[in-house]
Amino acid sequence: MGLLLIEQAFNGLQFGVMLFLIAAGLTLVFGIMDLVNLSPGSLVMVGAYLATTLIEWTGSFILGILLAMPSTFLVGVIVEIVVLRTLYERDHLDQVLATFGLILFFNELIRIVWGPASLYSGLPESISGHVEILPGVPYPAFRLLIILVGLLVALLIYFIVARTKLGMLIRAGASNREMAGALGVNIGMLFTLVFGLGASFAGLAGMMLGPLTSVEPGMGEPLLILAFVVIIIGGIGSIRGAFIAAVIVGLVDTLGRVFLPMLLRSLVAESTADTVGPALASMLIYILMAGILVFRPRGLFPARTG
């Protein structure tokens, strides 16, 4: 039981950092641009397809990933310029409808370019095996790499937001974008850059997800709702809140799906427990969100606004 708990805790952490990669861009976009954006799930899918294709073309896993990230950034920039710039002064319902349309557009575009069949991305031998995280506790090397990449990205985002001039502009735009614009900040360029960065983070999540699952149309959409839960729990506009909430949601979901069926087997039939347990684990996330909002209506770490 102890070894299983350790393994599933690492799985929960890996799922959490994957959610953080999506939620980080989502919370920046909503916090700074006041834009309700439903397209990150599609950008996860685009990142996965680009990475899989570029890995196949170059024959190098690392080179494929390195080329796919700026490619996804470019996709995000194009989406912001062509579609989103017309939505900033519109109400949130218009933004929801337009970005939902982006989901349909990207799904059909993927089917036209790559076809409806799933793609599969292999791993290089160096990260396809297992490593011992503790004596007698093997863990997949690629999942461990995802955790490390997620932690490094979290540190990088914190450094950019807290320690650089770009971060100062981002924080100024989040606090009071009208005042920042009056002081000479190019808000349009800032919005484009922020959305592009958010797209590249979502794309990176897709690149990491691709080798774990099949790459197929709509693959990022189930993660979108959880990413929204993450930013609501953590606090809209807060990178620190997004990271902590993503880890909490990842652990609750993963541990709940493994251990709730085991607990229920002592009360109900095994088949019933195996069906009800994962459903209860999914419910726990939303119960947790509701409980936190009762006591912290703006989330655990709300961004400061002026």
Region locations from a protein language model:
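Membrane-interfacial amphipathic/re-entrant helices at transmembrane-helix boundaries
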Residues: 1-21, 50, 58-64, 90-95, ...
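Membrane-embedded helix boundary and interhelical linker motif in transport proteins
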Residues: 10, 32-78, 82, 263-273
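Helix-loop-helix "hairpin" substructures at the membrane interface of multi-pass membrane proteins
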Residues: 15-16, 136-220, 239-244
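Short, non-helical or kinked segments that cap or interrupt transmembrane helices
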Residues: 24-48, 89-94, 166-169, 187, ...
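Hydrophobic core segments of alpha-helical transmembrane domains in multi-pass membrane transport
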Residues: 48-53, 69-75, 102-110, 149-158, ...
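Alpha-helical transmembrane segments within multi-pass membrane transporters and channels
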Residues: 59-102, 109, 244-249, 253, ...
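Transmembrane alpha-helical segments in multi-pass inner-membrane proteins
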Residues: 59-70, 192-202, 206-207, 212-286
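Transmembrane helix-bundle core of multi-pass membrane transporters
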Residues: 86-163, 190, 255-284, 298, ...
